[in-house]
Swiss-Prot record:
Subcellular location: Cell membrane
Subunit structure as annotated in this protein's UniProt entry: May form a heterooligomeric complex that consists of seven subunits: mnhA1, mnhB1, mnhC1, mnhD1, mnhE1, mnhF1 and mnhG1.
InterPro entries (alphabetical): CPA3_antiporter_subunitC, Mnh_C1_su, NUOK/Mnh_C1-like
NCBIfam families with a match to the protein in the record: 2a6301s03 (TIGR00941), PRK08600.1 (NF006372), PRK09094.1 (NF006573)
Coiled-coil portions: none
Species, as recorded: Staphylococcus haemolyticus (strain JCSC1435)
Cellular component GO terms, alphabetical: plasma membrane
Organism phylogeny: Bacteria, Bacillati, Bacillota, Bacilli, Bacillales
Gene Ontology biological process: proton transmembrane transport; sodium ion transport
Keywords: Antiport, Cell membrane, Hydrogen ion transport, Ion transport, Membrane, Sodium, Sodium transport, Transmembrane, Transmembrane helix, Transport
Family: Belongs to the CPA3 antiporters (TC 2.A.63) subunit C family.
Protein name as it appears in the record: Na(+)/H(+) antiporter subunit C1
């Protein structure tokens, strides 16, 4: 199962790199969001996709699940949500000010005034 998840992470990362290299601001924001999801999926896969009990319930459990990757992923999801919201607001404000979301057209917009 871990091998399949690693391939899925690679596909998500390659799609996100394609989106980040595009000229539209919305696609760039979607690409950065997708790369965070790919890295979260990679971290949770490297933590192990196994079944077990949490170590705080009972003392005589044969298989434990490591809670550290889950805690890290939860923190990363919150940070990714905040940065995505900031990027969306920044892209919207840039579109309202400059009238375009194309990165190539933004280069000379302020120089013409």
């Amino acid at each position: 199962m871990e091998i399949i998840m690693i391939f899925v992470c690679g596909i998500l990362a390659s799609i996100s790199v394609y989106l980040v290299l595009s000229k539209s601001l919305i696609r760039i924001v979607m690409g950065t969001t997708l790369i965070t999801h790919a890295s979260n999926l990679f971290l949770i896969t490297m933590g192990g996709l196994k079944h077990g009990e949490m170590p705080i319930y009972e003392k005589n459990i044969s298989q434990y699940v490591d809670p550290i990757p889950h805690a890290l992923i939860l923190t990363a999801i919150v940070i990714a949500f905040a940065t995505t919201a900031f990027f969306l607001v920044l892209a919207f404000r840039t579109y309202k000010e400059l009238g375009t979301d194309n990165v190539e057209r933004m280069k000379g917009v302020l120089d013409d005034d």
